[in-house]
């Protein structure tokens, strides 16, 4: 994989001003983004998140998943910590793309869970890859990570790439009546590390 750094700009947000670093995968044409906040100290573990694109959750406020809640909470946590990063990867629908994700949602509306829907469409439960993150982290100067995730695959992928994951920080937010079954499937079938105690319930109406 060939990751090319393109440019950096300021990104004002409700939680403060982040820096937005653009990257291009010259093999696939996909465009990825790294957000950084504060002055990153490479000698210290940096709070961060690896976030896969979710148009429906991140931009359209969908309650079918917890993605948008996780992204906003991660940005808020980073701002409160004074430094941190988010890698925003263009891997919509756990890697199957937006239109296939809508097809999967259609199957879920008919009773399939998130894993069954992917498999009925001929995909694995999770098609994402993470090899692009190492050159992105190298560019922004991150060597050690306190990773905000519930997904053990992300921790494993980072360690296999030689990135030191010093701590896993649970990020369990956004549970509501529309995504309860989805979150249960992520826990029981995809191995996401979740506990009922940590859930923050929102938008119950």
Curated annotation (Swiss-Prot):
Listed GO MF terms: GTP binding; GTP cyclohydrolase II activity; zinc ion binding
What pathway is this protein said to act in by its record?
Cofactor biosynthesis; riboflavin biosynthesis; 5-amino-6-(D-ribitylamino)uracil from GTP: step 1/4
User: What keyword terms does UniProt attach to this protein?
Assistant: GTP-binding, Hydrolase, Metal-binding, Nucleotide-binding, Riboflavin biosynthesis, Zinc
Q: Binding residues for Zn(2+), per the UniProt record?
A: 54, 65, 67
Gene3D superfamilies per UniProt: GTP cyclohydrolase II
Which principal EC class is assigned to this enzyme?
hydrolase
Pfam short name (any one): GTP_cyclohydro2
Q: Which InterPro entries match?
A: GTP_cyclohydro_II (IPR032677), RibA (IPR000926), RibA-like_sf (IPR036144)
- Note how many cofactor molecules are bound and how: Binds 1 zinc ion per subunit.
Keyword Repeat: yes or no?
no
GO BP terms: riboflavin biosynthetic process
Reactions listed under catalytic activity: GTP + 4 H2O = 2,5-diamino-6-hydroxy-4-(5-phosphoribosylamino)-pyrimidine + formate + 2 phosphate + 3 H(+)
Q: Where is the active site?
A: 126 (proton acceptor), 128 (nucleophile)
Binding residue positions for GTP: 49-53, 70, 92-94, 114, 149, 154
Q: Does the keyword DNA damage apply?
A: no
Check the record and name the CDD domains matching this protein. Answer: GTP_cyclohydro2
Family assignment?
A: Belongs to the GTP cyclohydrolase II family.
Output the HAMAP family linked to this UniProt entry: RibA
Describe the function of this protein. Catalyzes the conversion of GTP to 2,5-diamino-6-ribosylamino-4(3H)-pyrimidinone 5'-phosphate (DARP), formate and pyrophosphate.
Q: What is this protein called?
A: GTP cyclohydrolase-2
Q: Could you tell me which species this protein originates from? A: Shewanella loihica (strain ATCC BAA-1088 / PV-4)
Q: Which gene encodes it?
A: ribA
């Amino acid at each position: 994989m060939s990751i090319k750094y393109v440019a950096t700009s300021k990104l004002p947000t409700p939680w403060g001003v982040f820096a937005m670093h653009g990257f291009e995968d010259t093999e696939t044409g996909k465009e990825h983004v790294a957000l950084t906040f504060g002055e990153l100290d490479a000698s210290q573990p940096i709070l961060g998140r690896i976030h896969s694109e979710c148009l429906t959750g991140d931009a359209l406020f969908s309650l079918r998943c917890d993605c948008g809640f996780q992204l906003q909470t991660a940005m808020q946590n980073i701002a409160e910590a004074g430094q941190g990063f988010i890698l925003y990867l263009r891997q919509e629908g756990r890697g199957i793309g937006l239109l296939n994700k809508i097809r999967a949602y259609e199957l879920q509306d008919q009773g399939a869970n998130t894993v069954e829907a992917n498999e009925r469409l001929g995909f694995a439960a999770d098609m994402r890859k993470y090899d692009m993150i190492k050159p992105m982290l190298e560019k922004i100067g991150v060597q050690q990570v306190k990773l905000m995730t519930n997904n053990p695959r992300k921790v494993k992928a980072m360690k296999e790439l030689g990135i030191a994951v010093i701590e896993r920080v649970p990020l369990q937010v956004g549970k509501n009546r529309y995504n309860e079954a989805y979150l249960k499937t992520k826990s029981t079938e995809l191995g996401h590390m979740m506990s009922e105690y940590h859930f923050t319930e929102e938008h119950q109406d």
